[in-house]
């Protein structure tokens, strides 16, 4: 990993489980039937250079697990979300759009960032409401493997 930072967009199993539990225990009926949702896509990888930007969107998809089709939330249609590779020292911009039915943020776990880009709801950032977007300015001073995940 020679001087590169891999910000892994693997919405780790715990996050996927959190999404699934949240969606499956909600008291209100689903707004869209599972059958009408797009199928979860294969995770893609993207390499960003210093100064580049990336569009990231959260929205519901369907995925079949052990023969049962369930509604899950995905980043850019995939579970886990996109793998984002960034060189150490690079500064990138992530334009996030919340196309879900819940308020959320993105937390770049373990990355040293300004509070305004940390994604901790009602502490460092307001929740991003359904249909709204937020632009994250991220810098990567440290080499490492990181992941990003939602906060509700």
Outline where the language-model segments fall.
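Hydrophobic or amphipathic alpha-helical targeting/insertion segments
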Residues: 11, 132-152
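N-terminal, post-signal-peptide metal-ligating segments of extracellular/periplasmic oxidoreductases
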Residues: 2-135
